[in-house]
Amino acid sequence: MATPKAKVSKSRRDKRRAQFTARSKAAVTTICPNCGEPTLSHRACRHCGQYRGRVVTKKSANG
């Protein structure tokens, strides 16, 4: 196993770890082929309730 050449200070270690949360995780959206609304990828459409051509969630009359 490799050994470190020098001690990594707490400050340097914490700065490195902070970069993981600093990066924004942008939501990937696609256009629903059924209703045309933007929807999250690999999720059922919130407007029409379809995913990959099938109705997976029933929408009530109230919304």
Curated annotation (Swiss-Prot):
Keywords: Ribonucleoprotein, Ribosomal protein. GO terms for molecular function: structural constituent of ribosome. GO terms for biological process: translation. It comes from the Bacteria. The keyword Metal-binding does not apply. InterPro entries: Ribosomal_bL32, Ribosomal_bL32_bact, Ribosomal_zn-bd. NCBIfam families: rpmF_bact (TIGR01031). This is Large ribosomal subunit protein bL32. It comes from Prosthecochloris aestuarii (strain DSM 271 / SK 413).
